[in-house]
Amino acid sequence: MLNFVRIFLPFLKYQVFTDKTNDLLKYNIYVFDVDKKLNKLQIKNIIEYIFNIKIYSINTYIKNNKYCCFNKIKGLKTNYKRAFIRLKSVNIIPYFSC
């Protein structure tokens, strides 16, 4: 199990903590930024295995690139995939619940 977590944990970047996402915790919806290459089934398998929970549904979207300037260099910020994970009513993620 430890090898599985060590391999797939970098794909799960971090949980998003904003005012809107904290309001979603009341409805048992958690928001994570994940690797862009993962699909819904892979996200589901990783989270179910790491946290030992059952997932009801997953919604994802990819944020658009944003232009940024640093001194005279113009470039694009990297885009990422955001996953909204709804759990079954009896499950919670103990480290991220409100």
Swiss-Prot record:
InterPro entries referenced in this protein's UniProt entry, alphabetically: Nucleotide-bd_a/b_plait_sf, Ribosomal_uL23-like, Ribosomal_uL23/eL15/eS24_sf, Ribosomal_uL23_CS
Molecular function via GO: rRNA binding; structural constituent of ribosome
GO BP: any one term: translation
Disulfide bonds: none
Keyword tags: Plastid, Ribonucleoprotein, Ribosomal protein, RNA-binding, rRNA-binding
Compartment(s): Plastid
Gene Ontology, cellular component aspect: plastid; ribonucleoprotein complex; ribosome
Keyword check for Cell membrane: no
Subunit description: Part of the 50S ribosomal subunit.
Family statement drawn from the similarity comment of this UniProt entry: Belongs to the universal ribosomal protein uL23 family.
Role of this protein: Binds to 23S rRNA.
HAMAP family named in the record: Ribosomal_uL23_B
The protein's name in its UniProt record: Large ribosomal subunit protein uL23c
Species, as recorded: Euglena longa (Euglenophycean alga)
